[in-house]
């Protein structure tokens, strides 16, 4: 039996279709011959068939080879008849394998008329769909046996569901629609926009000025929200970093090494920069005597929110430290207890030194640095869109978070909605007023149709399958993927850029298929930091130019005070609408309240 699709998945071996059921797989060889015969007779038949069939839809491998040769000739603008197709197959060394040139003439003689090629193609497509269903069922059975033998049951169920969804996805349909059939739905959309205050049926972002420009996030759109990663920034090369077995230095750590997360659990380094020279640096001394040299943009989680090195204030900013840390440089233990917070004793500008940064894979993106075990941090914008969509407007949304855990996301949502400092929530310093505000908001928050999936190492296929399933259950209106550069395909690509391009293409296809906006959180490269004007540009999108090409909307996040603590626009952030396929570009200014885990509209 021919294997039509290679549906191997990461983490679980592909299961070949079984031929042990004693039945002939669904097929119609006469219909296959009639399709190919019609294509050899008529160019119009080729155009009709290629919209309905893929090569793998043919049961006989010989028919697959003939079909591929016909399409290649047709695509090159060359005639596709018995003579030219025979020559093409001979060039590929496949002519004898399909039965030689006489078989091509047999195909022509079996078809009564080329005009019916499209009808025959429908028969072939139906049989192919049934074969895929049989093959998927065989794999599902084998997955069930794998679960009985100790494989993760949740993963087995997810793979089984994905198999069935993949079968349904293979069905082809005519996507062109006559204009007259589109006029009334378009008029209905216009009426809905007018009655909704100018906002289309898309999901509102929650930012008034941005919604005025975009009319919300529209079905079928892929929206890229990109910012510089705040994780790690840059520390001096001699900065000590605790590891599960001792200590290393920032200059020595490599991708794949393990550091310690803020809870002192091992966390793996997934990215590391080259050594950077000439960056403005600060020496920060903490209340326990720890001294760390970091570049001006290094971010620290303080009691007042995220602050860069240049923004830290002596005697005012407090940084939470690890709960229990060693006081010596030997093997790490939990014997010595450290005060739960560290005060900033001094911050002073020092001469520039070589610096470097790393990125870690734990959910909070925190790792410990220095003998005092001081954590560093990162944050994103996507949750603001979800809060507007689900909490304010009661539209279903889902976030696939490869960066933060469920608990971290919920804590940020509560912080933003109840206006409670995230640092106070994490450290147990909430006041009675904080608890009262939280209680008032809990009812509305708990009723929001907002879904969170923090499954590690999510593949694009899994995201698509889960989004489809949720769409059927909840009338899903918004998908957020956080973030793009943490996605994995489970396949081999010639470069990471090619892999990210593939993710980009599939996210756009997902938006069109489910008819909803898909927001992909992405990263910018470090180019803005090297320019006098720090504002990011489209060319700064990290790892793939395809992101810019595939996206309908690209929003670049820029905070002026992240680069200069004395910037007159302190507390402001720019949402740079750098690409807007269906409208104008614009820069929208919002207020950042990072201590409350949110951005908000500027006061008017």
UniProtKB/Swiss-Prot annotation:
Highest taxon in the source lineage: Bacteria
Residues noted as binding ATP in the record, renumbered to the chain: 227-234
SMART domains found in the cross-reference section: HintN
Keywords: ATP-binding, DNA replication, DNA-binding, Helicase, Hydrolase, Isomerase, Nucleotide-binding, Primosome, Repeat
PTM info: This protein undergoes a protein self splicing that involves a post-translational excision of the intervening region (intein) followed by peptide ligation.
SUBUNIT field: Homohexamer.
GO terms of biological process kind: DNA replication, synthesis of primer
EC number from the UniProt entry: 5.6.2.3, 3.1.-.-
UniProt domain SF4 helicase: residue ranges: 196-462, 341-604
Record's keyword annotation contains DNA-binding: yes
Lineage: Bacteria, Bacillati, Actinomycetota, Actinomycetes, Mycobacteriales
InterPro entries to which the protein is assigned, alphabetical: DNA_heli_DnaB-like_N_sf, DNA_helicase_DnaB, DNA_helicase_DnaB-like_C, DNA_helicase_DnaB-like_N, DNA_helicase_N/primase_C, Hint_dom_N, Hint_dom_sf, P-loop_NTPase
Keyword presence, DNA-binding: yes
Annotated function: The main replicative DNA helicase, it participates in initiation and elongation during chromosome replication. Travels ahead of the DNA replisome, separating dsDNA into templates for DNA synthesis. A processive ATP-dependent 5'-3' DNA helicase it has DNA-dependent ATPase activity.
Protein name per the record: Replicative DNA helicase DnaB
GO CC aspect terms: cytosol; primosome complex
Region of interest: Disordered: 1-25
SUPFAM superfamilies: Hedgehog/intein (Hint) domain, N-terminal domain of DnaB helicase, P-loop containing nucleoside triphosphate hydrolases
Catalytic activity: Couples ATP hydrolysis with the unwinding of duplex DNA at the replication fork by translocating in the 5'-3' direction. This creates two antiparallel DNA single strands (ssDNA). The leading ssDNA polymer is the template for DNA polymerase III holoenzyme which synthesizes a continuous strand; ATP + H2O = ADP + phosphate + H(+)
Database matches in Pfam families: DnaB, DnaB_C
